[in-house]
């Protein structure tokens, strides 16, 4: 039987810093060690007590999580009842992923070391992912219906949802945004469209043979771009990609 490799001291220190803030399984995969080695590090350093902090959400952090549940994020249970939030993006949206993570760090919802590469051994699936600390503060989000989440989105949340799950249709010079909503029910899709149109003054409507996506007009590009300028640096990869025609002078 092959002897398991010893943990590098630098890796052990990183595990100590993150122990109790996310699942031991995540730490094992992240640092390429066994699950028992992670637990050994915790036991040797008196870290057996789990840390489940209470979060003080800023509105920006709330909107990142709410929109992410509909978009590229997910809530995962850690233990019997508490949750952590994680989100994954392709490397072409690395700066966007980092921007979101940094907003959560400001509220002590995550820490810098909880951002890591994913599938780096597969050139066709390179991605970047972050996760938050585990907390009972995320339980209410896990219990929300999609309709309740949609109702709580503000202009930032609506923009982030569009950036996560939307794309530019090139049927005109400026193009227009299309939001992928086929996973929503008819009621949820109608609620999303009404939320955009009522709160932002956009002209969203169902498209497609089965009316499962939501399209906006080219004029709505200016509305979304102006919101993006308020919150996200223009040089960020997601802004450069989704608002390319708006940035050309």
Label the model's feature ranges:
Residues 2-5, 16, 24-29, 35-249:
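Internal intein/HINT superfamily modules and their associated LAGLIDADG
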Residues 19:
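Primarily a LysM-type cell-wall glycan-binding module
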Residues 7-11:
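N-terminal positioning helix adjacent to the helix-turn-helix/winged-helix DNA-binding module
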